[in-house]
């Protein structure tokens, strides 16, 4: 019997030693070369490198130039031309004989302006202006979407750091459990089943710690990718938990001023302007042009005087497409369909935003309430674990009671961590929906 106890005791000691070695070999929470970032720094870095944000800024550049081109349509077009030629036979230029090999110069300057285009230029400008507004709203929307995604990865990494600490505390409690069971087994107050069960619980605690560390490394790598850094990134936590925001007027303001709503409304205005552009094909186009040219033996840079022949022309033209095989009708019908779709998308965007806001606000209030509940549960579970451990040590309780109490404490701590960061993530999601800080 004593030999059996010594064998069991030796196995338990071996398990404790291997656990201690594994704990000594686990990496430190922050390595010397690991980048540490605050949430504000992480968001700033992400806004610089995320492709969606780069694309949104590029769309603004394109929209700005589209608007500039639409404005330029109201200005005259100016063209300058100049040429020089010679031939191997004699000729006459402006009635004068020209010997072979002599250069003859032609120079011209033309200015043209559309006087009336059936309001096409005005509708194009309105379309470009609405497109620019949509691009601005897209940038704002992407800024908050990227910020929310970065915040989620940031808080997920912090949560996994806390879960590693929970797993470490679980491992320490498992060590205490196995030590108590060994002491009781040596004193004859516990059975071999108790020591073996405690050994299994210790192994499970070690596995939980390894899994928590692996999950933490994955979370830190995902955060590093989000902010454009190779390797792992350590987030710096904020010690203060923000209070619940005032959401009294949040929904009404979001349905009018949220970036996604503003973008959809701007695209609707752009589609409306495009319909007027297509209708301009039914109206005539009136243009005016003025041309001055010079031809002769005098170089262009010496002026238009001398023997050159100067010609000045002024022209007004009218063009009216009366029928083009129903192409105008097809274009007009297509733009009208796009306008109907844009109006439906604007209305659906508001409905979708309202539904998402309801979901995220529910998550926000629920997670905030869970913070208080889980904190109380941790206090109660810790006290219950202490009492149960003391009862087991004195022989008034069973190992099963102790394992149950310790499992309840571990789960309560996990729930507390998840509740805190679920609240922070839900808050970031609400900010992304409404387009401003809470």
Question: What are the residue ranges of the model-derived segments?
Answer:
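N-terminal secretory signal peptides that target proteins for export/translocation
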Residues: 1-5
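Bacterial N-terminal signal peptides
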Residues: 7-18
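Small/polar, glycine/serine/threonine/aspartate-rich low-complexity segments that form flexible
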Residues: 25-35, 81-113, 124, 236-247, ...
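Sec/SRP-type N-terminal targeting helices
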Residues: 54-58, 71-72, 101, 115-143, ...
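Periplasmic alpha-helical coiled-coil/stalk elements that build and connect Gram-negative outer-membrane
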Residues: 142-255, 360-363, 367, 408-409, ...
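Short segments within alpha-helical structural elements
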Residues: 204-229, 376-436
């Amino acid at each position: 019997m004593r030999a059996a106890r010594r064998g069991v005791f030796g196995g338990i000691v071996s398990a404790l030693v291997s656990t201690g070695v594994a704990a000594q070999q686990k990496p430190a929470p922050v390595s010397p070369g690991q980048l540490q970032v605050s949430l504000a720094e992480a968001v700033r870095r992400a806004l610089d490198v995320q492709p969606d944000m780069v694309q949104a800024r590029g769309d603004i550049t394109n929209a700005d130039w589209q608007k500039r081109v639409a404005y330029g349509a109201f200005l005259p077009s100016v063209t300058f031309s100049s040429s020089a030629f010679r031939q191997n036979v004699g000729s006459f230029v402006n009635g004068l004989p020209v010997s072979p090999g002599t250069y003859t110069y032609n120079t011209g300057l033309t200015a043209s302006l559309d006087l009336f285009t059936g309001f096409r230029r005005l509708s194009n400008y309105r379309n470009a202006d609405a497109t620019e507004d949509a691009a601005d709203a897209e940038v704002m929307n992407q800024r908050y979407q990227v910020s929310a995604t970065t915040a989620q990865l940031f808080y997920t990494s912090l949560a996994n750091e806390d879960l590693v600490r929970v797993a470490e505390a679980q491992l320490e409690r498992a060590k205490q459990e196995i030590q108590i069971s060994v002491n009781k087994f040596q004193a004859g107050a516990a059975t071999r089943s108790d020591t073996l069960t405690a050994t299994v619980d210790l192994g499970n605690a070690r596995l939980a710690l390894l899994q928590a560390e692996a999950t933490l490394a994955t979370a830190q790598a995902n955060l590093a990718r989000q902010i454009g850094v190779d390797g792992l990134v350590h987030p710096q936590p904020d010690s203060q938990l923000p209070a619940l925001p005032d959401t009294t007027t949040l929904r009404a303001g979001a349905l009018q001023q949220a970036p996604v709503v503003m973008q959809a409304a701007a695209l609707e205005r752009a589609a409306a302007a495009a319909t007027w552009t297509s209708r301009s094909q039914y109206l005539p186009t009136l243009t005016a042009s003025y041309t001055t040219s010079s031809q002769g033996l005098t170089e262009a840079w010496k002026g238009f005087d001398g023997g050159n022949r100067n010609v000045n022309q002024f022209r007004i033209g009218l063009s009216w497409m009366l029928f083009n095989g129903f192409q105008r009708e097809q274009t007009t019908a297509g733009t009208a369909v796009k306008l109907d779709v844009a109006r439906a998308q604007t209305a659906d965007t508001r409905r979708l935003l309202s539904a998402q806001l309801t979901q995220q606000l529910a998550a926000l209030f629920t997670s905030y309430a869970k913070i208080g509940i889980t904190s109380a549960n941790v206090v109660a579970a810790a006290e219950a674990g202490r009492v149960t451990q003391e009862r087991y040590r004195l022989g008034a309780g069973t190992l099963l009671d102790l394992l149950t109490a310790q499992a309840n404490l571990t789960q309560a701590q996990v729930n507390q961590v998840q509740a805190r960061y679920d609240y922070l993530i839900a808050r970031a999601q609400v900010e992304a929906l409404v387009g401003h800080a809470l």
